[in-house]
Regions:
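Short alpha-helical segments enriched in small residues
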Residues: 1-154
């Protein structure tokens, strides 16, 4: 289903390196990328930062930001991408943080709210999405949106 999209991403990034920082997708972007033979030429690895503690320790996310903004926010998505890019020393990083369900969070964010972050040597940005469906559908839509964002920005 996502194989053509994933192949397009890897082809477009030929000569560059990519890493991921994933929360609600739990490694789904990395799994999609590594399903393609030869993906190691581009994809170097990822950090699954499902908890705030891991976001702080492995990605260097400021605990003050996490406490005040919550993990599901544009600044956190951007900081995750920066942290992954720095930790894994790649040209490009994409990150995902969101609420796949079944419940929202203590900040009042709804199920399906996802922020996808992106960092390269020219820009740091993020996009906000609200996906519908069950937990698996939200996660799959987030993976697809992250891959499309990489294509759009390269």
């Amino acid at each position: 289903m996502m194989m053509p999209l994933t192949c397009n991403v890897l082809e477009k990034l030929s000569g560059k390196t990519l890493c991921t920082a994933e929360s609600c997708t739990g490694g789904g972007i990395g799994a999609a990328l590594t399903a393609v033979p030869g993906s190691s030429e581009v994809y170097k690895g990822g950090i699954i930062s499902y908890t705030n503690d891991v976001k702080q320790k492995l990605l260097g996310i400021n605990p003050f930001l996490l406490k005040n903004l919550g993990a599901v926010s544009a600044p956190i998505a951007e900081a995750m991408a920066i942290g992954a890019r720095n930790a894994l020393n790649t040209d490009i990083a994409v990150s995902v943080t969101g609420l796949a369900g079944p419940g929202g969070d203590d900040k009042g964010n709804p199920v399906g709210l996802v922020f996808i972050g992106y960092a390269d040597d020219k820009r740091i940005t993020s996009r906000r999405f609200v996906f519908s469906g069950d937990r698996e559908e939200v996660r799959n839509q987030a993976v697809e949106a992250a891959l499309k964002l990489i294509l759009d920005l390269n």
